[in-house]
């Protein structure tokens, strides 16, 4: 009987820890009856679980009689030890640039001691869809894409890394001397960034959108299938060899947003949000990324 009680209390502690991670110090907590109902447990067992969290130093509660109970102190790291996080899976772009490799390597290094895995997939739309469906725990996208997704419910912007952490710079690529004669622009419909930036750049212009794969973009311009694409320029010499030229994208803040990496979680996944806050040192992550980009360090992810 005692063993069964301990097992049940452990389940209740996990549920309470997940709830408390979504609260802030100073908040009035739900009543013990409400918590017992959410934990699908008895009031006595819920009280015992709450006392266990208090005695462990994870939280401190101030009880004010009829005015309720208030959370006055909380230790996120201590609470996280009571949450059942066996591993973390992050949806990430395909690592075809040193910047992506550095980001993947740097983020993984922050989760030292926690099993951390990547699911590499092309297209922010599919990464976010898998996140919302509970397939993965977090997703890396650009701030530009994130802003479009955050208009729908269910997502939380959990980590922001600043400009030029996702890509260096997007530019308009076309054949030399033909930037003023763009009639057909290539567009990979799986790329939220490219769709938004193409709409921003061309606005109401009478330009035909031609569906293509992002990684075929340059060759399709060379062949004459399209006149231009908005593309992340990694190697300028490659453009020169192909007879292409690049025009910087300016005059709209959304072009800069497309260069910033952010991490999304589900809005109700408080443990994952707190885990990111607890373990990620942004400066160390970005320094790691830059060492990979410069070749000082080999990526590991």
UniProtKB/Swiss-Prot annotation:
SUPFAM superfamilies for the chain: Periplasmic binding protein-like II
Against CDD domains, the record matches this protein to: PBP2_Yhfz
Task: Identify the Pfam families for this entry.
Answer: HTH_41, YhfZ_C
Could you name the domain of life of the organism this protein comes from? Bacteria
Disulfide-bonded cysteines: none
NCBIfam families (UniProt xref): YhfZ_full
Q: What is this protein called?
A: Uncharacterized protein YhfZ
Q: Which species is this UniProt entry from?
A: Escherichia coli (strain K12)
* Gene behind the chain: yhfZ
